[in-house]
From Swiss-Prot:
It comes from Saccharomyces cerevisiae (strain ATCC 204508 / S288c). It is a single-pass membrane protein. It is found in: Membrane. The chain crosses the membrane at residues 10-32. The lineage of its organism: Eukaryota, Fungi, Dikarya, Ascomycota, Saccharomycotina. This is Putative uncharacterized protein YDR510C-A.
Amino acid sequence: MLYNMNYLVFSLLWYFLVGGGKGEVCWRFLGIVKSPNT
């Protein structure tokens, strides 16, 4: 439960960061983290 809450908060924070103008860098980093093969 707590882990899910933290994940949700992190997701929201990441969403705001992406919307803040750093989206390109954030998405590239996120892509590397989630898809190392790419």
